Amino acid sequence: MIIKNVSLETVCGITSKLPENIHLEVAFAGKSNVGKSSLINGLMNRKSLARTSAQPGKTQTINYYNVNDEIYFVDLPGYGYAQANENVKAQWGKMIEDYLHKSKQLKLVFLLIDIRHAPSENDRIMYDWIRRNGYDPIIIATKLDKINRSQIQKQIKLIRTTLQAGADTQIIPYSAQTKQGREEIYEILDGVLAAENPAQE
């Protein structure tokens, strides 16, 4: 995938109606502070279009990034922020559930998991939630640069086991620092686009 132009096109809050996009969508889900914004910026070759923050719970909206006028990167609210009150947590959860259930253009969901730790209960719930909505999530194991290379396969196995994910669930280690894993993600996105527009192959 060659990134030519990107823009933040639509921001949806709790009461907003989801846009009726004509281009396909790929969504990015993950707990607060897992590195969603860093991944999206890395994929778009931008430093700060998707705002990163050391403060968890920063993304409280569904943000649609138009990429090359052919695909949307959809940044879903981070979940599992402990300091958010229960009402806010419920609202975020409903936003994510509504999006997964109602989006007509959603083709693929990336679920981000911190490679340093076993998936949390919220991660397991989200993984099952995505699958129940008819999607086979691709796991992006973020913060790859925070562990030694010798630990990578052990941590990937831990993620797979904790999520009870089958061998068909793809797990891609990703580093926001070195961009390791980005080309694999680009190949997946190219495949999604090719499947949607076979005449362009």
Regions found by a protein language model. Name each.
Residues K89-G93, S120, R182:
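Amphipathic alpha-helical transducer elements in NTP-driven molecular machines
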Residues K58, I71, G78-Y81, R116-A118, ...:
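Conserved nucleotide-binding/hydrolysis micro-motifs of P-loop NTPases
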Residues I3-T15, K146-E201:
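Canonical P-loop GTPase G-domain recognition
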Residues M1-Q83, A194, Q200-E201:
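Conserved G1/Walker A P-loop phosphate-binding module
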Residues N68-L106:
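Conserved nucleotide-sensing/catalytic segment adjacent to the nucleotide-binding pocket
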